[in-house]
Curated annotation (Swiss-Prot):
Recorded family membership: Belongs to the RLP family.
Positions of glycan attachment: N69, N105, N123, N195, N216, N248, N257, N380, N484, N673, N689, N721, N741
Organism: Arabidopsis thaliana
Name the UniProt record assigns to this protein: Receptor-like protein 48
Gene responsible for this protein: RLP48
UniProt-listed InterPro entries: Leu-rich_rpt, Leu-rich_rpt_typical-subtyp, LRR_dom_sf, LRR_N_plant-typ, RLP23-like
Length: 813
């Protein structure tokens, strides 16, 4: 028999075993919290998209690739569940490399307990389905920087718990104020704004929304941030925005005596079509920290700038490019002691030499303000980080004290009349833009010591000498533009930095070869070496730069073939290809353009490169530019044109053989110039597939055969030139072709028909036959008319004789 102590020991052991088993069971349950229906919905959602990096500038994590069946979905990357119910409540897939549309029957909408849905910075395309309204517990929703378009679904207005809505940087549209003919009918967007009574944060910026804001916005009583900038909204700001219930003010409007309990702290309404006076009611929003009213159309009226003096909490104020004739004293804004960012671009400014400004200001943008002297007050702006005084009328040298400001990093002094040698820049400089001035001398080697330099733009000055060899030491530079100076010599062999995205050295006197070390610049998008003396073969190695979008080699001394069996070209993102006015030779194979997908029908489906990377730096204040031949004239393409303008120019070379049939797959092409070569054969009928083509130049070649009548289907084709070839036959009668000047068909002896005066042979025979037939018909008609005349005379004669005899008989009786 067991003793009592042994029995107690056994009891303890069994109790411990039981506790251990129960705890394991509980841990097992806790470990596998995910519900099967939630797991299935997530896995189906994963399979609705394919995962692939789509933008070299925006790194993404392939989060959904780690999701596996038969594992706890609540422990998956970017997924959060309610610990009590096992329902998925948060899905954060921002920058997760997702590509594809969001379908209306997506399994996402089965996750009906979602409270937070973050899908921004993905390549999610198509229309945002109404099914989004099924997620009725959503508190936060973000599709920022996707590829969504169409109308914002009205079902968003049913999300009564929603506090954060971000649909910015898409292509959403909305009805205009008169699109339905009923000005009293609320649009879907207006209904959404009226129903989101719990929302604190709304960001609809950078879309294509238009129309007017709803007249009654007082229901948005909890609004903290409201961003509708960079759209096409019109009309005026509804007064209800300044009358939300929490506002409280009394007494006369004097500086400092307005009090408000409004939650509204961020209001971005810039870059729309708002018009009329800026409402004085803005002064009631004394809690505002950020305010943007840029590009407001006051109708050249006078702006009452005293409105802004009440906004003592302002940290950021953007009043750039107001359409006003008002001149304002910059000292007007010196009372805003919390101001960190101020943009008054496009406003006529008066700046006193004794001006004292808040030293806390970090960003100051005074572009196009008619400033004639370098502002002296800047010497005391010890916190200045970003300075833009471009497009003014400032002459002389840049004062040396500017470079002693300890935090200065971004400087834009372009489009002035600064002269002298380039100043010695401080190590803090990250971006220096000094284009379109009168700087001269050599580029100083001290520039190479700027270890943080990302952007250097010295275009359109009078610099001479060679590109410093020490440029090879750059490690961080991304944009280097030395365009239109008098630089000579050869490129540094190890150019420039592997981080380079944009290089423009066009319109100089550079010689030698294009440095093959550029092959290391895997992020290079923009390469322009036009109008130099570069003597080299075609750089086939550029094909390895998969991000290259603009390639301009025109007006140099490049030579040799542009096709090689060993080095076939494939430019998946190329938008502009200009190799004109060189000495290229050889034949192009039929499939030469097969790999140029950015100009084909699949263009840009997964290309989300933000314009800022193509256009320039820091909010787009600098823009790339190239000179292209379009419709027979040279034109400068600047800024956003790069994103939509697709052109191929191989003119002025010695290319021969047939025009490649594969040219017909480049359906996004807008300009095609193959003139002044030695192309032979027929004009390929596949050109009729270029449905976006606006300009076509095939002149000065040796083309034969007829002009394909199918070209008449190209409704956007405004200009074409077939002159100086060996074409023959009738000129097609399509309107697009017949509207051209006769010079577009000159020196083709075999061409005939309008707009030429000479008729085609068949046309002359047809006209003679038609004329003879008309003469025969006229003669036959004349004979018939004579017969009818005799019959009519006979008909009239018989009754006349009868009546005459009858009357005579009566009279004699």
């Amino acid at each position: 028999m067991h003793s009592c102590s042994e029995r107690r020991m056994m009891t303890v052991i069994w109790s411990l075993c039981l506790i251990f088993c129960l705890s394991n069971s509980i841990l097992a349950i806790a470990k596998d919290l995910c519900l099967p229906d939630q797991r299935d919905a997530l896995l189906e959602f994963k399979n609705e998209f394919y995962v692939q990096e789509f933008d070299p500038h925006m790194k993404c994590e392939k989060a959904t690739e780690t999701w596996r069946n038969k594992t706890d979905c609540c422990s998956w990357n970017r997924v959060s569940c309610d610990p009590k119910t096992g329902k998925v409540v948060e899905l954060d897939l921002m920058s997760s490399c997702l590509n594809g549309p969001l379908r209306s029957n997506s399994s996402l909408f089965r996750l009906q307990h979602l409270q937070s849905l973050e899908l921004s910075s993905n390549n999610i395309s198509g229309i945002l389905p109404d099914s989004i309204g099924n997620l009725k517990y959503l508190r936060s929703l973000s599709f920022r920087t996707c590829h969504l378009f169409g109308k914002i679904p009205s079902s968003l207005g049913s999300l009564s718990y929603l506090t954060h809505l971000d649909l910015s940087y898409n292509d959403f549209t909305s009805e205009g104020p008169d699109s339905g003919g009923n000005l009293n009918r609320l649009t879907d967007l207006q209904l959404v704004l009226l129903n989101l009574s719990s929302v604190t944060w709304i960001d609809l910026g950078s879309n294509q929304l238009k129309g007017m804001l709803p007249s009654n916005m007082s229901s948005l009583s909890k609004l903290v941030s409201f961003d509708i900038s960079e759209n096409s909204f019109s009309g005026s700001i509804p007064s209800s925005l300044f009358m939300i219930p929490s506002l409280n003010f009394s007494g006369p409007l004097e500086i400092g005596n307005i009090s408000s309990h409004s939650e509204l702290g961020y209001l971005y309404m810039g870059e729309n079509n708002f018009n009329g006076p800026i409402p004085g009611s803005l002064s009631k929003l004394v809690g505002l920290r950020d305010l943007s009213l840029s590009f407001w159309n006051t109708g050249r009226g006078i702006v009452d700038f005293s409105i802004f003096l009440h906004l003592k909490s302002l940290c950021s104020l953007d009043l750039s490019y107001l359409n006003t004739r008002s001149m304002v004293d910059l000292s007007f804004f010196s009372h805003l002691m919390s101001l960190d960012e101020l943009d008054l671009s496009g406003i006529n400014l008066k700046i006193s030499s004794t001006l004292s400004f808040p030293s806390a200001t970090g960003t100051l943008i005074l572009a196009s303000c008619n400033i004639v002297e370098f502002p002296k007050f800047l010497e005391n702006q010890t916190s200045l980080f970003y300075l833009d005084i471009s497009a003014n009328h400032i002459e002389g040298q840049v004062p040396e004290w500017l470079w002693r400001l300890p935090t200065l990093s971004f400087v834009n002094i372009a489009q002035n009349s600064f002269s002298g040698e380039l100043p010695m820049l401080p190590n803090s400089i990250y971006s220096f833009i000094a284009s379109d001035n009168q700087f001269s001398g050599e580029i100083p080697r001290t520039v190479c010591e700027l270890v943080s330099l990302n952007t250097l733009v010295l275009s359109n000055n009078k610099f001479s000498g060679s590109i410093p060899r020490c440029f090879e030491n750059f490690k961080t530079i991304s944009i280097l533009h030395l365009r239109n100076n008098s630089l000579s010599g050869v490129f540094p062999k190890e150019i420039i930095s592997e981080t380079l995205t944009s290089l423009d050295v066009g319109h100089n006197w550079l010689s030698g070869q294009l440095p093959k070390s550029l092959i290391k610049c895997t992020d290079l998008e923009f390469l322009n070496v036009e109008d130099n003396r570069i003597n080299d073969k075609f750089p086939f190695w550029l094909r390895s730069l998969s991000n290259l979008q603009i390639l301009v080699l025109r007006s140099n001394e490049f030579y040799g073939p542009i096709f090689s069996l060993e080095d076939s070209l494939s430019f998946p993102k190329l938008r502009i290809f200009d190799i004109s006015e060189n000495h290229f030779t050889g034949v192009l194979p039929s499939d030469y353009f097969a790999g140029w997908s950015a100009m084909s029908s699949v263009v840009d489906i997964f290309d989300t490169t933000p314009q800022v990377h193509i256009l320039g730096v820091f909010q787009g204040y600098y823009h790339n530019s190239v000179v292209l031949t379009n419709k027979g004239l040279n034109m400068e393409l600047v800024g956003s044109g790069f994103t939509i303008y697709k052109t191929i120019d191989v003119s002025g070379n010695r290319l021969e053989g047939d025009i490649p049939e594969s040219i017909g797959i480049l359906k996004e092409l807008i300009v095609l110039n193959m003139s002044n070569n030695a192309f032979t054969g027929h004009i390929p009928p596949s050109l009729s597939n270029l449905s976006n083509l606006q300009s076509l130049d095939l002149s000065q070649n040796r083309l034969s055969g007829s002009i394909p009548p199918e070209l008449g289907k190209l409704t956007f084709l405004e200009w074409m030139n077939f002159s100086y070839n060996r074409l023959e036959g009738p000129i097609p009668q399509a309107t697009q072709i017949q509207s051209q000047n006769s010079s577009s068909f000159a020196e083709n002896p075999g061409l005939c028909g309008a707009p030429f005066l000479n008729k085609c042979g068949g046309e002359e025979e047809e006209e003679e036959e038609a004329t003879k037939q008309e003469e025969d018909e006229d003669e036959e008609k004349e004979e018939k008319n004579q017969v009818f005349s005799w019959i009519a005379a006979a008909i009239g004669y018989v009754p006349g004789v009868f009546c005459g005899l009858t009357i005579a008989h009566i009279l004699t009786s």
